Every structure is written in structure tokens, then in C-alpha cells.
């Protein structure tokens, strides 16, 4: 039972094997016929080139396309087998004509490939699977057919072998001619980008030199704008010139302004050189007349360095209003012009007045006046106030000695005034000369020193007739 069951599948398996052998015998015979003689080799190009031919070989292509099954493969090569003895003469003529037609078709195909670039791909994609489905023996023939393609055109070899990749290759090639047309603006732009830094550097350098030369020539930014408007017809404001010097304009506007400013600067410099005047103020006058502007002049602005400014501040603190000789000495020490130093001191005094409206200069004599004239402010000072009072008494003692004759003449009047006003005022008047002559002896006591000072002041500054009566009314201050 086991043997019978095993024998049945062997029989069944042998049947398809025999069928396959029968199917393989026919292509083997066909391949043998292809190998036997060169005549059969010419038949295969006929079958192969027939899909590409249009006029006479169209029926053969239809037959191959209508027989996609494998059974028609052995039936197709059967008709040329009985005609083998007549092949050496008839097929040679056919092959010559077919080769000429193939060459023409190849040239047409090359034109199609070269001009559009991708029209050959769909027929190549359809013909290759048809050759694979119809006969496996025709698979090497496309390689034989591609040999003349390789010799005649290198583009045909790469495109039919790879259908989809060729689309990826040919599509980027299509934008290449399109890119070639907009390339001139793109070629102009990339060099502009590397040139921009150099242009910016040139603009920065020109802006610096323009500002320096403009200041040397004595022009303001408004003068430049008006002069350019009258000379070249383009009115520019002062802010435009200042923004150009500060590099605050756009790149295009800077490039537009640069040639105009260069031209104006050259004209102004030529006029200043032709005028041959030493000072920049005088240089500006002919150029202003050349520009057609009114005779407005501007002095050159001087910049003072920090160390020079510190030295001037020190000298200002020492003396706020120096004389012309002192100004000349300061100018020589600092290597500056005398006029510049004089103007600086004037400006510094004005600045001091703005900062301190009540300056310290008039306040200096004011503290001495109340101390000398009012006894109420002098007496409560204590020991600290004795020093200035002693100095005042010592300085005023000289006036008392020089005016001793005047004091002798004033005693009767004071006694008379004292008798009229009150009898108690006469004894202090007699004691005044005894107190004032020895100032060092009376400096130890606080009370006599103010009296001596007041007596001296009364003798020197006040009216003798009215002074004693006013100053000696406060009697309670005496011990």
C-alpha cells in the first residue's frame, strides 16, 4: 500500500516533467538552428527589427503581440525551417535592405532622442517586456541591437536600459537650457555680493574723507546740500548729507550720492587751491561765491584734547578772568592759539554762570560785613570768633594811631553829645583810647575787643557826630 501510494505521485510528477521537456525541446531545436548557420542569425534580426519597422514588417509585429503565450513561441520559428535551402541568396538581399532601413530608423530614433529627450522611453519600455514575454531566446538580441546604437550615439545606450532613471536624468537636463537664459542676471548677482563688502568699505572710507575735507574747507552740511542743488540740480537737505556721513542711508542711495559728492568735493578743492588763501574761512568765501550762495562763513571748529582741557580747568579754578598776558602764557604752554584760549575762558565763565547763578565771587566780602558791623553776630561766637576779631583790632589799631589827632578833637563833641543824651556815656568814651592802643593786652578778654573794634570802625567809617550815640546805647553788654 505504501509503494502504490508513493508510485502515484511519481507518475503525476513525471507528466509535467515530460511536458516541460517537450516545451524545452522546441526552443533547443530553435537555438540549434540559430547556431548552425549564419542564415538563421539573419532571421532573428528580422523578427527583432520588425517591431521597429513601420511598413512591411507590421504584420509580423502584430503576430508577436497577439501571441503572448508560451505556446506560440515554438510555432513562430517553424515556417522558416522548410525555407532553409533558399536562405543564402534571398535573405542576404533582405538583410542588406533591412540594414539600410535599420540605419535610417536609428537616425530617426537618434533625432527623437536628441530633440525631445524622452519620447523614446515609452516604446522602449513596451518593446522590452514584449520581447521577454514572447521568446526568451530574443533577450540577447536587444544587446546586439544596442551595439550600433553605442557606436552611433552614446545617448541611446543609457536611456533604453534604464527607463525610470532616465526620466530623472533627462528632467534635470531640461531645466538646464531654461537656467541658461536667466543665468545672466544670476551671474551678475553673485559677483555683486562679493563686490558689496568692497563697495561698503569704499563708501565708509569716502564718507570719512568727505567729512574731514568738508570741515577743512569750512562748509556745513547744509551748504553742501544747497550747493549741490544749485550746481547739479539735485537739492539735498542737511539731514541727507549727515546721514551719508554717518552711513545711515541705504546702499543704493549711498551709491547714488557718492559720485555727486565726489564731483562737488573736487570742484570745491580746485576752487580753494586756485584761490590760494591760507585760512579756511577765506577758502570758504570764494567757493561759496562759486556755488552761488550768500557770503555766509563759518569758522573752523577746534577740538580741544582732554589733557589740554584739564589744564585749562585748573587755570580757570585759579583765575577765572586772566589778563591777556596770562592768556598768552597759557597758550604758549599748551601750544594753542591765544584766541582759542580766550574764547574758551569766555565760554567757561558763561557756563559757570549757568551752573551757579549766585557765583562765589560776590559772596566773599559778605561774611566780613555782618561780623564787622553787627555786634550781635560777633559776641556769641566765643573762642572761635576771637581770632578774626584780634586780626581786625590789630589792623584797625594803626588807623587809630594815625587818627589820634582826630580822636582828640572828637572827645569834646562826644562829651557834649553824651551830656545831652545821658551822663553815663562819658566815662566809656574816656576809656576808649586806653583800650585800643594795646591790642595784645586786650585780646585775652572777649568784651573789650569788640568795643575797641567798634570804636575804630566808628572813627573810620561812620560820621563822628552820629556814630558814638548809636554804638554806645547798648550799655548792658558791659560787665
Swiss-Prot record:
Residues 1-86, 166-200, 275-298, 357-393, 409-479 are annotated as: Disordered. Residues 275-288 have a biased composition (Low complexity). It is found in: Cytoplasm; Nucleus. One of its GO terms (cellular component) is chromatin. Residues 76-85 have a biased composition (Pro residues). InterPro entries: HD, Homeobox_CS, Homeodomain-like_sf, Lambda_DNA-bd_dom_sf, POU, POU_dom, POU_domain_TF, TF_octamer. Isoform 3 is B-cell specific. Isoform 5 is expressed in B-cells and the immunoglobulin-expressing T-cell line MOLT-4, but not in the T-cell line BW5147. Disulfide bonds: none annotated. GO terms for molecular function: DNA-binding transcription factor activity; DNA-binding transcription factor activity, RNA polymerase II-specific; RNA polymerase II cis-regulatory region sequence-specific DNA binding; sequence-specific DNA binding; sequence-specific double-stranded DNA binding; transcription cis-regulatory region binding. Residues 297-356 bind DNA. Residues 12-37 have a biased composition (Basic and acidic residues). Residues 389-410 are annotated as: Leucine-zipper. Keywords: Activator, Cytoplasm, DNA-binding, Homeobox, Nucleus, Transcription, Transcription regulation. Residues 195-269 form the POU-specific domain. It comes from the Eukaryota. Residues 416-425 have a biased composition (Gly residues). Transactivation activity is enhanced by transcriptional coactivator POU2AF1. Residues 38-60 have a biased composition (Polar residues). One of its GO terms (biological process) is positive regulation of interleukin-6 production. Transcription factor that specifically binds to the octamer motif (5'-ATTTGCAT-3'). Regulates IL6 expression in B cells with POU2AF1. Regulates transcription in a number of tissues in addition to activating immunoglobulin gene expression. Modulates transcription transactivation by NR3C1, AR and PGR. Interacts with NR3C1, AR and PGR. Interacts with POU2AF1; the interaction increases POU2F2 transactivation activity. Belongs to the POU transcription factor family. Class-2 subfamily. This is POU domain, class 2, transcription factor 2. The lineage of its organism: Eukaryota, Metazoa, Chordata, Craniata, Vertebrata. The gene is POU2F2.
